[in-house]
């Protein structure tokens, strides 16, 4: 365990909390100088590129600093679930296929992941998936109406393990407050991580948000709708932990 992990989570979270709007002249989201990701596009395969070029014009939504009509974007009225950082798309595709009665808006900044997700959507005929390739904080802030979401998934975000990088973690007090604002009453925020320090960090921040209520006594059992990933299965066999948190909007 690193020296950073030996520091009390509460003390570190308090330092981050001092960066909330009431402690600064400008809202932290008004200028996105600190982001929770580093844009490393990597190499896109030929198949990913082809599917991206073919599918993104059909299922992609461009970022605009204006409210998005989600029902219009999906062509129907149904519960809307937003997933932040869908990676290569396997989990999102499995959940969307298992729940055709719900619509899924996936956000990912990395091109190969977007291409892979486009491929999965095409191969599985998923009519209930839309994709955005943009900063999720800006999408949430500028395009999602208050109370519009039935759920938000944040699965295995970058833990930013070094203490000096904690400010880059996606789960921060201000962001959780923003997510809670976008959830409909009874809607949920589901986070999952395989990094223990980040798990406790998440738990403390989510528990401190007055609009959210924990559905469990601490960490939650993995909900049936979240499939195990290959990486997660391998880690569990090696004795590594995975922590789920599910909070509902009051």
UniProtKB/Swiss-Prot annotation:
UniProt GO molecular function: tRNA (guanine(46)-N7)-methyltransferase activity
Known EC number: 2.1.1.33
Pathway recorded for this protein: tRNA modification; N(7)-methylguanine-tRNA biosynthesis
Alphabetized PROSITE patterns for the sequence: SAM_MT_TRMB
Binding locations of S-adenosyl-L-methionine: 83, 108, 135, 158
Keyword flag Nucleotide-binding: no
Catalytic activity: guanosine(46) in tRNA + S-adenosyl-L-methionine = N(7)-methylguanosine(46) in tRNA + S-adenosyl-L-homocysteine
Binding site for substrate: 162, 194, 229-232
Active-site residues, record numbering mapped to chain: 158
Pfam families: Methyltransf_4
Keywords: Methyltransferase, S-adenosyl-L-methionine, Transferase, tRNA processing
Xref: InterPro entries: SAM-dependent_MTases_sf, tRNA_(Gua-N-7)_MeTrfase_Trmb, tRNA_methyltr_TrmB_bact
Function summary: Catalyzes the formation of N(7)-methylguanine at position 46 (m7G46) in tRNA.
NCBIfam families: tRNA (guanosine(46)-N7)-methyltransferase TrmB (TIGR00091)
Protein name: tRNA (guanine-N(7)-)-methyltransferase
Species name: Azoarcus sp. (strain BH72)
